Amino acid sequence: MGLEQTINSVLSQNSPNDFEFIIIDGGSTDGNKELIETHADRVTYWVSEPDNGIYNATNKAIRVAKGDYVYFLNSGDLLYDQTTIQKIEPYLDQTCGIYYGNLIYQEKDIQVPWIFPEQLSFSFFLTENINHQACFIKRSLFDELFFYNEEYKIVSDWEFLIYAICKRNIPYKHIDMLIAIYDTTGISSNANNREAMNQDKNKTLQKYFPLFVQDYRNIDAIKLKRVQQFLFIKKFKPAWLALKGFMNIVLLFLPKFKKENA
């Protein structure tokens, strides 16, 4: 059972310091409530009740959390090993609002390490994301910025990060260590949800970054036009040979030009 593995992963941590362990269950009837009850004495807070989706449940957890940083695992996700919390704690010194490490992506019996970049950018978030299983976020940031958007089903954590980092310049830091084993059977990894994800991402980009979006569209249009021109020229042998000859002349003279100006 996915939830049981996740609970055991958290309870097996050998950190010398106490940390809150909050479980939000959506009123499931598959035995999860009974499972949680067996660990109730080691869980800081738990509730089993119907919710309005992943981000509604996540926001419930944020609102009851009292620690300086919050971290989220879905049912089926695992902390990388028993020392993960112990190793990560020294980094959480409140210098940065967001700390993130690396993940193991697991699909059935296949595990693939995923190393996130040291530097994040708007262009990174256009096509990628930092999974919440890799992120430790300062609890107060949700009060300062906003809680997860419950209208979205999949990309609210992406929306929070791109807004916090690219719009508000919240300090962040990459920690080069494996944080968790991410179960890729979740909703965000389902290829059938890609269209809904892209639609919600576009809503966020239009809301917070309308000028950036227009610039990127213009750049893409220019790139496409140049490619089309290149392919058009290549169709006509005389023009193509002339262009190749010009490129060869440029390549021949460029090293000499660099040397003369050295």
Model-identified regions with their sequence ranges:
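N-terminal leader/capping segments at the start of a protein or of a new domain
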Residues: 82-85, 207, 259-262
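A short, terminal or domain-edge coil/loop segment
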Residues: 152-160, 207, 228-240
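Catalytic core of nucleotide-sugar-dependent glycosyltransferases
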Residues: 177-179, 190-217
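Membrane-proximal basic amphipathic "stem/tether" segments
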Residues: 217-262
